[in-house]
Amino acid sequence: MVGEDRVIMSVKELRRVHVIRQTREKKLTQVQAGIVLGLTPRHIRRLIERVAQAGDQGLAHRGRGKPSNRRIPEKVQTKALTLYAQRYGDFGPTLAAEKLAERHGITLSAETVRGWLLAKGVTHFQRRKRPHRAWRERKAHVGELVQLDGSHHDWLEGRGPRCVLMAYIDDASSRVYARFYAYEGTIPAMDSFQRYIQRYGIPLAIYADKHSTYHSPAEPTVAEQLAGVEPRSQFGRALGELGVELIPAHSPQAKGRVERLFKTFQDRLIKELRLAGGSTLDEANRFLEDYLPIYNQRFSVQPVQPADLH
């Protein structure tokens, strides 16, 4: 009997069996049993009655072996997995759960979707262990430092031309501004920065890599050497006239926030553009106008200090 109980009972239930037996054998009072199990004497009496009627099995959870009332109906699971296979096969569980709710009215947690996919042998989304990195503390104020970079990628997945996403991410808040261009160069840099200014104002500093668009590759002239200044690109001169400091990043790791943004966008944004049917630069940029406010509302953070230094 005990062996059978042990198969179907939890450790907590087995402990109750032992204590209730001791109580029925008058080795413990009901008050003492209640103290041991953390239950009231009234509850102890109910357990004693249950054992008297059904034996030790009466202390097993009454819902064990029965389907949970909270269990998601099988037809919902089937529909969700069918939609995933048909439309979202390369999506991770989080984005898939968002789209199932947003586009099909099927509300599921990401962990539920993850579990269903793993049970079906779908594992492409498994998280990989990230290499350890030394985190640089964020700036305290919005507008104090903005990271800028361009990402060359097949953003439209062959539906349109390859293009470059010029992205600005505020260091203090992770707020993002971005726009697609045909190439990464002076004109796209100037145009995107002008649009950034019109939207948010002039930041104190821009942090960009050593691409020739941002930092001149020319050797300093004798006059520049004597003056202790570096040659500047056209973009660098424009920032200088606005009083914006242009800080060079010497490695991709130094631009950690914008590099991580591109990894996120190369997963999420590409799929969102696919669902929206974007196939031209104009369509992609119109999509960004609606997408970025939603993205920023979800993923930006509260800066340490409330003042905006733009």
What is the role of each PLM region?
Residues 11-17, 78, 163:
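Short alpha-helical elements of helix-turn-helix
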